[in-house]
Amino acid sequence: MSTAVRYYSRSGNTKKVAEYIAETAGVDAVSVDSNNAELSDKVDVLFIGGALYAYGIDENLKQYLKTLSGDKVGKAVVFSTSWLSKHALDLIKDALTNKGIKVESDTLYFKSKAVDGCRDEAVKFAKKYI
């Protein structure tokens, strides 16, 4: 099963969770603003994460989500970190659904300050989909 991990992080919290997931999947976690973020081949599972900034997701993540399509992504699994709320999960899920991409209903969320102790939970979550 092919897997990819993409994320956007300003503070490093979402990046840390992405790296835990990627390590479990045996792939690299790639920031959506990197030159190599584009999916060149179809993936069975795309883990995609971001956080809430001023009640929305970052513009880099918004633009990346617009590039995705159902012919490149079998299903998406969403994760987020935020000190404020889980609303980024819904925003990301909605953007993916609007692109015709199947999105798992189960998500992964950590409050920003709890990220340091989240490795085991992130690994357990990732293993459900790989």
Please name every model-derived segment.
Residues 36:
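Acidic, amphipathic alpha-helical patches
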Residues 3-4, 9-32, 40-130:
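FMN-binding flavodoxin-like domain, especially the glycine-rich phosphate-binding loop
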